[in-house]
C-alpha cells in the first residue's frame, strides 16, 4: 500500500506501475462547498482522461462518469449522490478486467466499462472544491520508488491542471511512457 497524505488540490500524481485487475485507488476527503462547486477525480493517460468521475452539486447532486479519448468525450453516465457541504467521503475505484467498480462511502455506485486500456493509465488528477486527506494505492507490486517522483510531477503540473480543459499530462511533463 502507498499513501499520499494531504495532497494539494488541484494535483496530478504519476502512477508508477500499470493499472491491472485487482488494483484499487481510494480517495478520502471532504466536500468544501455545496450547491455552487464541483470536484473531479480523473485517471489520466497522455492527453486522454481515461476515467472522469465528477461530483456535481447543481440542484440534482449527480456524479458524471465519462472518458475523453483523442479529444472526444464519450457518452456520459449520470448517477445521483448524497454528498453535501463538509461531508466526508471515501471514493474507491476498483479495477476489474473489463470495468471499474466505483463506490462512495462503501456503497457501490456504478460499474463503468473500460474505454481505454487500463495499462496506459499514467496518473491521477484531482481538482475542484474539495479537501483531500489521502490517496491510497493498493494491489500494486511496488517495485519502484513512488515517493521521490510524486513531488517532481506534482510541482510541474498542479498549477495548470485546473485551468485548462485537457490537463497537462504526465507524459508531456516527464517525457516517458508507461506501456
Swiss-Prot record:
UniProt xrefs under CDD domains: GLECT
Keyword RNA-binding: no
A Pfam entry, by short name: Gal-bind_lectin
InterPro entries, sorted: ConA-like_dom_sf (IPR013320), Galectin-like (IPR044156), Galectin_CRD (IPR001079)
Annotated keywords: Lectin
A GO MF label: carbohydrate binding
Residues in Galectin domain copies: 11-138
Protein name: Probable galaptin lec-7
Amino acid at each position: 500500500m502507498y499513501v499520499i497524505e494531504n495532497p494539494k488540490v488541484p494535483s496530478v500524481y504519476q502512477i508508477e506501475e500499470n493499472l491491472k485487475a485487482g488494483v484499487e485507488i481510494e480517495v478520502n476527503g471532504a466536500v468544501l462547498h455545496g450547491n455552487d462547486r464541483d470536484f473531479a477525480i480523473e485517471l489520466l493517460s497522455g492527453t486522454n482522461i481515461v476515467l472522469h468521475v465528477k461530483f456535481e452539486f447543481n440542484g440534482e447532486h449527480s456524479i458524471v462518469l465519462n472518458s475523453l479519448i483523442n479529444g472526444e468525450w464519450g457518452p456520459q453516465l449520470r448517477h445521483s449522490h448524497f454528498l453535501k457541504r463538509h461531508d466526508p467521503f471515501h471514493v474507491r475505484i476498483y479495477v476489474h478486467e473489463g470495468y471499474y467498480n466505483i463506490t462512495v462511502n462503501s456503497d457501490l455506485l456504478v460499474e463503468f466499462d473500460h474505454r481505454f486500456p487500463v495499462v496506459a493509465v499514467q496518473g491521477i488528477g484531482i481538482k475542484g472544491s474539495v479537501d483531500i486527506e489521502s490517496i491510497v494505492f493498493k494491489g500494486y507490486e511496488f517495485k519502484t520508488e513512488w515517493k521521490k517522483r510524486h513531488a517532481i510531477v506534482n510541482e510541474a503540473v498542479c498549477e495548470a491542471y485546473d485551468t485548462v480543459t485537457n490537463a497537462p499530462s504526465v507524459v508531456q511533463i516527464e517525457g516517458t511512457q508507461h506501456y
